[in-house]
Amino acid sequence: MSWQTYVDDHLMCDIEGQHLTAAAVIGHDGSVWAQSATFPQFKPEEVAAIIKDFDEPGSLAPTGLHLGGTKYMVIQGEPGAVIRGKKGAGGITVKKTGQALIFGIYDEPLTPGQCNIIVERLGDYLLEQGL
């Protein structure tokens, strides 16, 4: 299965008639493995800061999580495993696997919990596969 299939079928999937706004699978080095057409153009330093927060939990809290120039307020996640951010009625969930970061961006009417389930389910599966 291609990485694009994971994004299209497992991240941008239909949940009660709704779906994520954007999604991507990005390597720890910042390379894009696959992304939805709507995923924001990001800067390498934005991904580097996210990776740093996985290694040093809490490092993003003072500045916020930035992706594609959008700032998200960091909310409770799972240190070293999941980072969650909020902006208005939407937000972002980032799950770290052995080799990649799984990104999900959502907006109302999708809920934070639904985004977490979508992103973390794929991330957990990839971890089980050694990825």
From Swiss-Prot:
It is found in: Cytoplasm, Cytoskeleton. GO terms for cellular component: cell cortex; cytoskeleton. PROSITE patterns: PROFILIN (PS00414). It comes from the Eukaryota. It holds the Pfam family Profilin. Binds to actin and affects the structure of the cytoskeleton. At high concentrations, profilin prevents the polymerization of actin, whereas it enhances it at low concentrations. The variability of the residues taking part of IgE-binding epitopes might be responsible of the difference in cross-reactivity among olive pollen cultivars, and between distantly related pollen species, leading to a variable range of allergy reactions among atopic patients. This is Profilin-4.
